[in-house]
């Protein structure tokens, strides 16, 4: 984290704002984007005097100003988009980074047990590896091996890892995901 230049950060799909508040404590001025009004209210209270601006918006329509963020975080949010929504957003995210700015993204991958459950249950697959869900998110996309890396291939990939982790939910043995850390060239 020390090598990331301080400045403005963008936290997409911030939820309750845990990452946004932590980033603000590390010296960033944070735009925290969240569509769920319950979470935006919680974050508005949680942030206190921290430099966190709550942006109530769907991430697919949030206007990312070109070259304005030294850090963009998309933790556990991009898999709730269809690939046809993901690629245009990924382009805007890359354009939104300042020269030398960093991007951190984390997603579910197709070897996650949830993928198998949805496929075997007959849940409607609306795009490859993308299933229609009931509820707020509407869809879930499980990234194929190397897909997250390809989405952000315009950046210098500093770290890319696909792994399985023990799940917090005792009914699920593990989760599978991909983590990407990348940097925009000077």
Task: Give the predicted meaning of each segment.
Residues 1-10, 15-64, 81, 88, ...:
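Class I (Rossmann-like) S-adenosyl-L-methionine-dependent methyltransferase catalytic domain
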